[in-house]
């Protein structure tokens, strides 16, 4: 029986994780949940999974949740302290880190320091603090399993092989909803256009990142730290069918790939049960029903966000942290109708141009740079810092 703390339980990954838990009550128990503001869904999750502890964003939400729960319920905490308490819950064997954005960094770091194994769905943890986090993982002797479908595919394709035999990692990308759109049309993209992903069902922020291809950029940076491999050995191929989730090419010319229907339950379950596997309810892949699998090189001129991620890795040190912070601000501005879709990458690049990369030695320093990046991007976009 593996005991889980799920950070971000009401988001897309959190909901899928709990679907797997519900399907295998003999294998998993939920001891802690954290959520943002979706109290109705959180209440249902509490009633179904009976966690000992839950944490929400602020005190007002905590009080409201307390009123919604009739009878004896879990301990209800709030804020960063509450998230950390959930991430370090004494009974938890594994923490599913699925909080969206840089907000997931502090509780994930706390979980590692508390000796918890991590199922990592939060890209930004490694993007903003990759070196620090991987050093912590080694120092505390914990396991970190990727939940991203692409990194899970790479992880699976590396099993039984030596890293020194790897020629390159090939991350696949669907290309998003605008893969075939001409450059001049991208400035006219609406929020509803961008939220209509052709293959995957995801949360709003990651769906916009997928449309801009910044999502793939974040994954390139994440892969660099997860697999301790230089950026020049990480390639990206556009694969519109999203059947091959990523590949590893070896020095002898062999390529290992992981295939499957696009459904996040599969990589989540693998992270929860590694090295074993469990039934997930994912639709079987019928190869005979496929009309074909196609691959293309990314067009950096139409999707400059991906190129910015490679630049951030090349600049190194604190630059990925700034890039990520600016992206979160710019995506929020687009979702709120303040800027055009094409202005997302422009805002990120301008913010990066203002930054002088420097070494980050602590999580606190990462948070300071993250704040600087957000404020600079807001300033450049003319958004009130508050």
From Swiss-Prot:
The alphabetized list of GO BP terms reads: isopentenyl diphosphate biosynthetic process, methylerythritol 4-phosphate pathway involved in terpenoid biosynthetic process
Q: Which NCBIfam families match?
A: Dxr (TIGR00243), PRK12464.1 (NF009114)
Q: Top EC class per UniProt? A: oxidoreductase
Its annotated function is as follows:
Catalyzes the NADPH-dependent rearrangement and reduction of 1-deoxy-D-xylulose-5-phosphate (DXP) to 2-C-methyl-D-erythritol 4-phosphate (MEP).
EC number in record: 1.1.1.267
Its recorded name reads 1-deoxy-D-xylulose 5-phosphate reductoisomerase
According to UniProt, this protein's pathway is: Isoprenoid biosynthesis; isopentenyl diphosphate biosynthesis via DXP pathway; isopentenyl diphosphate from 1-deoxy-D-xylulose 5-phosphate: step 1/6
SUPFAM superfamilies assigned to the protein according to its UniProt record, in alphabetical order: 1-deoxy-D-xylulose-5-phosphate reductoisomerase, C-terminal domain (SSF69055), Glyceraldehyde-3-phosphate dehydrogenase-like, C-terminal domain (SSF55347), NAD(P)-binding Rossmann-fold domains (SSF51735)
Q: Which organism is it from?
A: Geotalea uraniireducens (strain Rf4) (Geobacter uraniireducens)
Q: What is the lineage of its organism?
A: Bacteria, Pseudomonadati, Thermodesulfobacteriota, Desulfuromonadia, Geobacterales
Q: Which reaction does it catalyse?
A: 2-C-methyl-D-erythritol 4-phosphate + NADP(+) = 1-deoxy-D-xylulose 5-phosphate + NADPH + H(+)
Q: Which Pfam families match?
A: DXP_redisom_C (PF08436), DXP_reductoisom (PF02670), DXPR_C (PF13288)
- Positions contributing to NADPH binding: 10-13, 36, 38, 122, 124, 203
- GO MF term list: 1-deoxy-D-xylulose-5-phosphate reductoisomerase activity; manganese ion binding; NADPH binding
Q: Does the keyword tRNA processing apply?
A: no
Provide the residue positions that the database annotates as binding 1-deoxy-D-xylulose 5-phosphate. 123, 149-150, 174, 197, 210, 215-216, 219
Q: Which cofactors is this protein said to need? A: Mg(2+); Mn(2+)
* Keyword annotations: Isoprene biosynthesis, Manganese, Metal-binding, NADP, Oxidoreductase
Listed Gene3D superfamilies: 1.10.1740.10, NAD(P)-binding Rossmann-like Domain
Report if keyword Oxidoreductase is assigned. yes
Sites binding Mn(2+) sit at 148, 150, 219
